[in-house]
Amino acid sequence: MKDKFELVSKYSPQGDQPRAIEQLVAGLKKGLKHQTLLGATGTGKTFTVSNVIQEVNKPTLVMAHNKTLAGQLYSEFKEFFPNNAVEYFVSYYDYYQPEAYVPQSDTYIEKDASINDEIDKLRHSATAALFERRDVIIIASVSCIYGLGSPIEYGEMLVSLRVGMEISRDQLLRKLVDIQYDRNDIDFQRGRFRVRGDVVEIFPASRDEHCMRIEFFGDEIERIREVDALTGEIIGEREHVSIFPASHFVTRPDIMKKAIVNIKAELEDRLQVLRADNKLLEAQRLEQRTNYDLEMMEEMGYCSGIENYSRHLSLRPAGVTPYTLLDYFPDDFQMVIDESHVTMPQIRGMFNGDQARKQMLVDHGFRLPSALDNRPLRLEEFEKHINQIMFISATPGPYELEKNPDVIEQIIRPTGLLDPIVEIRPIQGQIDDLMDEINNRVEKNERVLITTLTKKMSEDLTNYLKEAGVKVQYLHSEVKTLERIEIIRDLRLGVYDVIVGINLLREGIDLPEVSLVAILDADKEGFLRSERSLIQTMGRAARNENGRVIMYADKMTDSMRNSIGETERRRKIQIEYNEKHGITPKTIKKEIRGIIAATSAADEREAVKQHDLSKMSKKERDVFIEGMEHEMKEAAKALDFERAAELRDALLEIKAEG
């Protein structure tokens, strides 16, 4: 079993990275449960964490607050650890519209999803790696706290094969069917097997290129070979191979029988309650739907939405903590929470959001109460899984600071870039003053971000600047994801010089061309003008050597004082380090596509605006459909189920028309 992490990099730790690494490692070796790394933007936090992982040498779970960030971290860790198992575990849905009921309009929306096969493969690869080795880093989104099948069943049902092992060909085939592999001699792909005489070829669920060829002599395995599934080329000989289940929700036939008995008993109890409350329509609906699911489970071994019966399938009592990816790790694993000021509130809030939606389905007879146990972890359940944890953030939140107030700092950027200079100017005459600043920046081919507090002020300011001849765009919450990507990209390209918005903290706004961030109404205390938000907003100017922040305010609030004090403190440390080491700050040069996940749809922006499908070319039509699919996913993410369902139906119509 491979168990040593090996960090590969042409860089060595610089600035205050060595001290941060040393402190984090010492804390972990001392047995500290919670540690926080306060790392300013662009200081190389991932490299620091990689050094810690190598030094401590334990299986590691790195959690991020969305798929995009998880993808970036996966690429970075893969580069740092090419000889170890760096795995990726995020939701495998490209699009996920959860089952929902809207009582106001009596609208039931069925679950609808499209599964990404590549991500499904990576999820299987991640769980398999945890059973086979210790040098494992799994990069996961918060979806890793959602219910997953039992790791005990998963481990016990794996099929272990060795050369010389006595097992008949037919016994092996039965075992493969039990772990949800399909026989298909023609269309051979992941999660399938094929048979040719005394040779069985198995395509593991965690692979997409190589399969295993098992050769029998009578009732004995004579040879095991790894084969290229496409070309048939022999990759190598194997003495032993483990075939993991093709689904994380594997259920043995004997357990399925018990589960069906328990589901029927729960259904009877629930029907009595509904009828006693005179909810006859709900009772009829529940009886019809559940009996249909039970028939499918008896005949086929599964049904649509089988995860809603997961508590019965694992024979757990009501309310018990569900199994998740965290249960697949060994007891001594360590956790890293990236952007913890965002990720921890997300972990805290996931249970409540999930329960509110499911409770509606239970109340109106769409689901049995046991569906409530197919859920994400509560915060206190998540905490019980923690062995040792490191929080990483430029602005740690109250949760992290409460767990361990002794924060480890990483302030120096390897590029020498400083935190921006912050100025406070009076509100009176702020627009004229802002115009002068914008003109100065435009002359130098630099960009400006302006943040306001209200939608009306953003709109009025944008219109005023447009009339004054400024190339400006307003970025508000109603701007769709694709459009947002285009606007940010166009700011970098110089189509716009200024972006006005309310919340400019969202991902994708770290732009090297931005040398000025203007904060209007900086003295109005609240979420968008809190100390943490102000530090994050000011950080948007930290990628440019001429970075500057102007706060327009008539009084100094505690949030302003603290955020300015923190920025000046960091700046002083950075200047001293640069002077001591002869470093001159230089603006980061980034490829336009490097910072933003630009898509083909963003390249075809004009085509998307054409709504007459009959006049579109195939390429334009494909782009239009892609744009609609993005909008549908965003609507589902925002819990706007009705809008997502409308878009889904419209897409089906368009696709049906050919």
From Swiss-Prot:
Cleaved signal peptide residues: none
Keywords of the record: ATP-binding, Cytoplasm, DNA damage, DNA excision, DNA repair, Excision nuclease, Nucleotide-binding, SOS response
Record flagged with keyword rRNA-binding: no
Taxonomy, superkingdom: Bacteria
InterPro entries assigned: Helicase/UvrB_N, Helicase_ATP-bd, Helicase_C-like, P-loop_NTPase, UVR_dom, UVR_dom_sf, UvrB, UvrB_inter
Motif, Beta-hairpin: chain positions: 92-115
Binding site for ATP: G39, A40, T41, G42, T43, G44, K45, T46
GO CC term (a single one): cytoplasm
BP GO annotations: nucleotide-excision repair; SOS response
One MF annotation (Gene Ontology) recorded for this entry: ATP binding
Pfam families per record: Helicase_C, ResIII, UVR, UvrB, UvrB_inter
UniProt domain UVR: residue ranges: 622-658
Main location: cytoplasm
Compartment list: Cytoplasm
Domain (Helicase C-terminal): residue spans on this chain: 430-592
The keyword Cytoplasm is annotated on this UniProt entry: yes
Domain Helicase ATP-binding: 26-414
Free-text note on domains in this protein's UniProt record: The beta-hairpin motif is involved in DNA binding.
Family note: Belongs to the UvrB family.
Summary of the function given for this chain in its UniProt record: The UvrABC repair system catalyzes the recognition and processing of DNA lesions. A damage recognition complex composed of 2 UvrA and 2 UvrB subunits scans DNA for abnormalities. Upon binding of the UvrA(2)B(2) complex to a putative damaged site, the DNA wraps around one UvrB monomer. DNA wrap is dependent on ATP binding by UvrB and probably causes local melting of the DNA helix, facilitating insertion of UvrB beta-hairpin between the DNA strands. Then UvrB probes one DNA strand for the presence of a lesion.
Assembly description: Forms a heterotetramer with UvrA during the search for lesions. Interacts with UvrC in an incision complex.
Name of the protein: UvrABC system protein B
Species assigned in the record: Listeria monocytogenes serotype 4b (strain F2365)
